[in-house]
Each structure stands twice: as structure tokens, then as C-alpha cells.
Amino acid sequence: MGWKILPVCLSLLLPVVLIQQVSSQDLSSCAGRCGEGYSRDATCNCDYNCQHYMECCPDFKRVCSPELSCKGRCFESFARGRECDCDSQCKQYGKCCADYDSFCEEVHNSTSPSSKTAPTPAGASDTIKSTTKRSPKSPTTRTIKVVESEELTEEHSDSENQESSSSSSSSSSTIRKIKSSKNSANRELQKNPNVKDNKKNTPKKKPNPEPPAVDEAGSGLDNGEFKLTPPPPDPPTTPHSKVATSPKTTAAKPVTPKPSLAPNSETSKEASLASNKETTVETKETTATNKQSSASKKKTTSVKETRSAEKTSDKDVEPTSTTPKNSAPTTTKKPVTTTKESKFLPLPQEPEPTTAKEPPPTTKKPEPTTRKEPEPTTPKEPEPTTPKEPEPTTPKEPEPTTPKEPPPTTKKPEPTTPKEPGPTTPKEPEPTTTKEPEPTTTKEPESTTRKEPEPTTPKEPEPTTPKEPEPTTLKEPEPTTPKEPEPTTPKEPEPTTPKEPEPTTPKEPEPTTPKEPEPTTPKEPEPTTPKEPEPTTPKEPEPTTPKKPEPTTPKEPVPTTPKEPEPTTPKEPEPTTPKEPEPTTRKEPEPTTPKEPEPTTPKEPEPTTPKKPEPTTTSPKTTTLKATTLAPKVTAPAEEIQNKPEETTPASEDSDDSKTTLKPQKPTKAPKPTKKPTKAPKKPTSTKKPKTPKTRKPKTTPSPLKTTSATPELNTTPLEVMLPTTTIPKQTPNPETAEVNPDHEDADGGEGEKPLIPGPPVLFPTAIPGTDLLAGRLNQGININPMLSDETNLCNGKPVDGLTTLRNGTLVAFRGHYFWMLNPFRPPSPPRRITEVWGIPSPIDTVFTRCNCEGKTFFFKDSQYWRFTNDVVDPGYPKQIVKGFGGLTGKIVAALSIAKYKDRPESVYFFKRGGNIQQYTYKQEPMKKCTGRRPAINYSVYGEAAQVRRRRFERAVGPFQTHTFRIHYSVPMRVSYQDKGFLHNEVKVSTMWRGFPNVVTSAITLPNIRKPDGYDYYAFSKDQYYNIDVPTRTARAITTRSGQTLSKIWYNCP
């Protein structure tokens, strides 16, 4: 019986299976469907144009395209290893299949025109098309691209976002592929209409960048977000290039992302709308889209090529949910948006997905729809206005982004502005999230600020990136301050002309930034640039205008890379002079100081500006601009005089020197001057000059503002200023020197802080420059200002509030309202105001640098903390200590950072008032090898003698070691399980560490390659210092040779 039943069962089952197969075939297979017409109901299509629209069934290639024929292969992208090809460029290489003419020639030619429609696309279109084809082929590539763009963008933003966006984009790319193919089919069907539409669109496109922009923007909507995606598509085609540019830009500048945003913004807006709308509208859109689809198609054709490619990519991505289209899009979109937002920079990237997503829903159609819509919307328009749009092709957009912001001010009118507007608009939409985040990040502000300025300059792109990040923080605060005015003025004065116009728009925004920008570039960049420009030497010119640009640009560019951007040149122009030169000097010293100075430098530029004026004053000097500074320096007396006058009359000088004022700053002021630079911009605002002085002063206070953001810049400046001062003398050759410095600076800026080290020496000379304060040397400075002498004399035996090494190796001491750069071979640099350079309210409670690859520096003041990368404040700070360190409260008097070593996690010990200590263990991350670790620095405390003494002492204390060891081993063990930061209970220092003094005034972690964990740990108590053995939790007092004081050993005091 069993055997008989079996066949019956089988016979019953077979039909079911077959039916399923057939139905599945109908749904997702091309078996028996090759060449059938396009159907919107089908999950995937098998007509011979489905590849163009990326809507082919997975087995289309296997089932419907024979190897040696072009049947069904016209929209394939080129792939190696085939006997013959059918892509649009095969004729060029003589590898077309025999039946290419009958199947594909017409298709490719007709497409071209549409592509052509879009100017850029012309060539691109083919390419794009082919690319598109290719792209589709490798959604992966697309995805990657997307990721890349994201990465670029993200560089600034968090990698996490990046990941999410990439993943979304990649997954979407798959779906996208399918979906897009479907859409493609539609398009293809509608192709003819498309052509018309294309024309229409094209006109749009052509007619105005706007339209294109719009297109893009429109697209932006969908596309906008798309845009992001587009970049990926871009890759395929010209757009890619463009986009590439964009992305690059993006990469270069987060701003770009913004642009993306911009488009996005529209897009975003639209996207947002779209998303909502999408859902709702989606349906409509779908229909509408359909139409648009055709239009879109055309567009697609044209745009398509452009965008299409992008789109396709986008699409690909978006298609993610092939079907989900709607929902997916909606949802996706949203998420994307979110991402976008989060990413803020990534935005672009994300947007991409976002967009992509969105479009998908509509699927291509919506896109068109959107595209269209947005276009109309225009948000872009303004953008488009700018040429950007045209470029929009996509790439452009990003670019605009940058511009966007600055222009924003102007933007509106001016496309340049687009940026801002972009942001503005985009912002809104995008901001929706993205934007906002961005701003949140600061970036935005930064961008805003920075951006603006930057754009002003053209920097745009460059700034874009840098700008954003850096500016972020700085920017904002700074702007807070007078920034605004500054831009107005500062720039103005100097650039008066240039600036103004520039400012016209940017400036304003810039103002916000202006200063900042400069700082933003902050320091680094600025100097960097300056330097270079400086070399330019234009010194003189510099004052004239450069300055302006400089700030504008420098900042931006610099920020981007600072260094690089700088080169970009914006700076250059800037340097063009003046500034630069000064910076040069400054710069150099800065390097010396290096890092800090560097930042300083960056700052410097600003100061430079101030300086500039000074030079102005010095004018002749100007030539020596640096000299100016130099001059001051050179003529120490002169400078001093200047100083004084400056101080005295800062106003007058100010006017001229507004920046000069800087000078006054010199002594104490020096920092101020620095500030001034920063402020300077401010100043300009006011009266520019006159105000400057005044402002400047306030600046000090403002400084804090700045501080937050600007400060760093300020810092930089001051440092720079000082440095430059000194340097200047050295620099005498200003221009040349400048150039040299520039290199250094670049290096420094780049972080080549290493150069910094060498720099420090320069710095010291700077000290002389500090001349402002210390005309010839510290002591002198002191003499100059007897009232300040004690407070500004690091060697008076008073304990410092904080001592730390920046990531670039610079050793910095903070006490009261001043800080000093320390060098193993020279006396301390002249004092500079903490507020002016770092932008943090002084005096600080403590400072420490993490012992990890990033080497971020943290400043604690009351209930807030700031995080710096070398001397540039990170965006989004200050933050609350209680939130950033697991609930840490109380008055922190010192902090000791401990490196991760074997099973010991990275942590930081906070010493509190009253002899208590609290340990915070960082969240444990996988071990990674640091690339380009800190420069090896030979601090005087590393001398053999000191080590020997420590060893002897160690033997003496031997007995306690085991004991302590046991006491404390449990704590470290406890810590290692953390997967997030963990704050341990507060305990008495004596219960945790052996040999520690009751009062710890400061602590420092010094890099030392001779130690197993790479560091030496020291604690200071009044006039005594202790070497800390972390594993045994023992502190050993260091006995110094007779006549050697802590100041002599640590600060190299005379």
C-alpha cells in the first residue's frame, strides 16, 4: 500500500510545485518572458530595456542575453572578459557584438541627446548611461561610492553614522537595483516622451543652473537626498565626476554635504515632505510620478543620465525596498533623513540614502516627481541660482554646499550663497534632521559661519570640510562674540574692500564665523595657509585685503584640512599677504610652539589680521609684516612702543592696527591681541579699528565666548601672535620664512606637530616677540608690565593649575589667566592669555590629555569641560562634566590620565579638593595600533640623572610596593569589564596610593617610549614633584640636586 500511496501523493504535490514555479517565474524570473513589454504590475521586468532602468529580474542576464549578441544587453555596463560588448562605448574600442547596430545603436544615440540635454551630461550621459548600466551592474560599487561619500563626509561626522548610512545604502542598493530597473523600464517606455520632457527639462536645466539645480534640487528632494546617492551614481558617470567632486567636496567639506543637504534640503525638505508626502503622495507620486516618470525618464534620460545614473544608483539604493518602495521609501527615507540629520555631515551621504530611498518609493517616478517638484520648489533655486545647480548635476551641489553657507547670507541672491540657502533651505528640510544635526554638531554653525566666510572666498569647497568641523565649535562661540561684527569689520577693515564684498554675504554669516573661520581654521589652517600665503608675501598686500580673505578663507580652508585648504590658497590670497606674512612668522613660531602655537597660528591668522593692521601701522614693516610683528619684535622697542601705543592707543593703532592692537595684547595683552585677531574681526565689526581695541579688551571676556569656540582660535592666535613675534625676528625674511613656516605649519597644522617641536624653539624667540609683553624675553616682558610681572612669571615658584602634553608633543603649563609653552631647550615662552587663545574662561581647574591614539586634551572649569585636538576645540563643547564623566561632581584640582596597558584599562584619576580621588575608567575599546604616534620629545625631566634618582628612591620605598600592589589590584580588575565609561567611588588618596602628598596641585602624563606603557606619570604638590608607579600605586618624591628647583627642572627657568 505504501508504494501505491506514494505516487498518488507525488502526483498531487507535483502540480502544486509546478504552479509555484510558474508563479514565481512570473514574479521574479525571465523564463519565457524575454522581450515581453514592460508592466508596472510585475515585480521585475524582462524587456530589453530593463537593464537601463535597473528593473530586470535576477536571471535576465542568464536567460535573455546571449553571450555573442546585443539582444537585451544594450544597457549593460562594460565588464572585462567578454567576447564582445554592447555598452555605449564599445564602438570606440572596436569590441561591439556583431548585432550591436541593429539592437543598440539607436538606443544609445537617442539616449545621448537626452543626456546631452544636460550640458554636463552630454558626455557624461553616455558615460553615465553606460555607467549607469555599469553601476547597476555593481550596485556594490554604487554602494561603495555612497559609503565613500559618506565616509568623506563623515570624516567629520561620526563613523557610526557612516556605518548606518553605508549599510542602508548598500542594502538599498540591492533593492534599489531591482526597483530602479522597474522604473527604468517605465522610463524607457516613456522614453520618447522623455525626450520631449527631457527637452523640457533640459531647458530647465540648461536654461538655468537653477533649473538644473532645481532639478537637482528637485531631484534633490528625492534626488537631493538622492544627491547623496547620486554621488554614487555619479561615479558611474560624469555626474560622478561632478559628484565626485562633490563628494570630494563633501569629503573635503562637510559643507558639501550641506550642499547635498542643500539639494537635500530641498530634497530634505522635500524629502521630509516627500517622506511624509511620499507616503501619501507616494501613491500620487507614483501616478504623478509615473508621468513624471516619463518626464523623469526624459529627465532620466537626460537627468537620468546624469542623475539617472545617480538616480539609478540612488535608485538602486533606494529601491532597496523594491516593493516597499512606498513604505520603504517612506520609512527608509525617514530613517535616512534621520541619519542624515545625525550624520549631519554624512548627510550628504545619508541624504543619499535618504533621497535614494525616497525616490525609490516613488521609485524612479517619484524621483522625477520629486525631482520635478523640488525643482520647482526650488529651494534649490537659489542654489541653482548659483551655478551650483547646474553643476548640481550633483557634484555641484556639494560644492555649493560650501558656498552655500557663506553665501547664505548673500546666498540667496547669490547662488554662491546657495550654500547657505542651501543649507537654509536644505537646512530646513534637511535640517529637518540632518541639517540640524549638523548645526548641532556645530558643524553647521561652523559651516554656517565658516562656511560663509569660506564661500566667500571660494574656499568654499575647501572650507567646506574643514570649516565645518572645526568651526563647529569655535565658530559658534566666536560668532557669539563679536564675531559678527568682526567679520563685518575685521575683514572689512582689512579687506575693507574685498572683505566687504565678500562679506557681503558671507561675511555676515561669516561674521559669525569670520572670526571663527579664521580660528576655525582655526588656528591651524589659518596659519597653515597664512604661512603659505605669507610666503606669498604679499605681505603688504596682505594687509590690504588678504586679510580679509584670509580669515575668510583661511579659516575655512584650513579647517578643512586646514593645512591643505590653506594651501588651497584661499589663504594664499589671504596671505597674499599680510596676514600671512605675519602668520608666517607667527606661524613659524607657532610651529615651534607647535601645536599650540599652531593652533595659535591659525589663530594667528586672525591675529595676523590684527597684526596686519599693525603691520599697517608698521606698514613699512608690513613689508615685513611679519616684520610687523616682526617689527614689533624687530623693533622690540618699537613694538613695545607700538605696544604701548597700541595699548595706550590701541584705538589708533587699532584702527590701523586694530589688529595692531593685538600688539598691545602682546604683553599681557599679547594674548589679547591674539584675541584681537579673533576679536579683530570683531573689531572690524564695530568700527573696525577703533572698536577693535575696545572690543578687544572686552574680548578678553568675550574671549571666553570665543573660548568656547573661538577660543581655540584665539589661543591660536595669541600664540601665534607671540610666536610670530619672535619668529618674526627670525623670520626676517618674512616672505621666505613665511614660506618655510608655511611648510612647517602645514606640517604642524596637519598635525605635523612634530615640526612643532622644532618650532618651539622658534617659539621661544617668540617669547621675545611676546615681546609684546616681554619685549625681549620673559623677564623683560615682566619688567615692562611690573603689575603683571608676578602673575606672568612662570618661574616665581607658584604651583601651576595644570600641565599637559598635547597630542603633537607640545608641553603646556596653565596658571591663573595665562599659559606657557614649555621647551626642553629654552626658557618658557612668553605668557599668553588662556581665554584669548583657548577660548576657555580662566583660571582653569585642571587639564589632561588622554593616553590613546586620538590624544584629545580636556579642560575642566567649574561644571563644564572642553575637548581639544591639540589647540583646536572640538565641535559641540563645552559640555557638562557630570554627563561626560559618568556623574563626576565636585571641585577637581588635578587629573592624571593613565594609559591602557595589557589588562589595565585606560582611565583618568581626578584629584579633588580635600585629599580625595575618584577614578573614571573609559569604555573599553578593542586595541588598535596608533598610526603616527606622538613625536618623541626629550623633556628635561627625562634626563638619566632623574631616572637614576627615581630608581634609588624606589629601592628605598621597596617595602611598600607589595602592600600597595595588593591594595590596588582589585580596583583595576574591577574596571576591565566595563563596556562603557565607569566612575568609581570617591576615596581618600591615601587609601588608594602610597606616598602621595595630601595636596596635589596638578598631575601630568608624559610620553616616554622607554616605559612599557609608553608614559611617565607625575604629580605636583607645591614645590615638590612625584613620580607615580601606576602598577604598584606608589608615588615617589623626586629628590632634586641641590640648587635645582621644580621650576628649573620642569620649566627650564633660568
Swiss-Prot record:
Repeat region (sequence), residues: 317-324, 325-332, 333-340, 349-356, 357-364, 365-371, 372-379, 380-387, 388-395, 396-403, 404-411, 412-418, 419-426, 427-434, 435-442, 443-450, 451-458, 459-466, 467-474, 475-482, 483-490, 491-498, 499-506, 507-514, 515-522, 523-530, 531-538, 539-546, 547-554, 555-562, 563-570, 571-578, 579-586, 587-594, 595-602, 603-610, 611-618
> Which organism does this record belong to?
Mus musculus (Mouse)
Start-end of Basic and acidic residues biased regions: 188-200, 302-318, 364-399, 427-550, 563-614
* Effect of substituting C930A: Cleaved by subtilisin-like proprotein convertase
Query: What gene is it encoded by?
Result: Prg4
Q: What is the effect of changing C795A?
A: Not cleaved by subtilisin-like proprotein convertase. Not cleaved by subtilisin-like proprotein convertase
The miscellaneous comment for this protein is: Different forms varying in molecular weight have been observed. Such forms are possibly due to different levels of glycosylation and protein cleavage.
Q: What's this protein's name?
A: Proteoglycan 4
In residue numbers, the region (37 X 8 AA repeats of K-X-P-X-P-T-T-X) covers 317-618
Family matches, as PANTHER family:
HEMOPEXIN DOMAIN-CONTAINING PROTEIN, PROTEOGLYCAN 4
Q: Which residues does the annotation flag as glycosylated? A: 109, 135, 237, 250, 301-302, 306, 313, 327, 330, 338, 354, 362, 369, 377-378, 385-386, 393-394, 416-417, 424, 432-433, 440-441, 448, 472, 480-481, 488-489, 496-497, 504-505, 512, 520-521, 528-529, 553, 560-561, 568-569, 576-577, 592, 600-601, 622, 624, 628-629, 692, 808, 810, 938
Q: Which GO terms describe its cellular component?
A: extracellular space
Listed result of changing C851A: Cleaved by subtilisin-like proprotein convertase
Task: Quote the subunit structure annotation.
Answer: Homodimer; disulfide-linked.
Q: Null phenotype?
A: Mice are viable and fertile. In the newborn period, their joints appear normal. The aged mice exhibit abnormal protein deposits on the cartilage surface and disappearance of underlying superficial zone chondrocytes. In addition to cartilage surface changes and subsequent cartilage deterioration, intimal cells in the synovium surrounding the joint space become hyperplastic, which further contribute to joint failure.
Q: What ranges does the record list as Pro residues composition bias?
A: 229-238, 400-426, 551-562
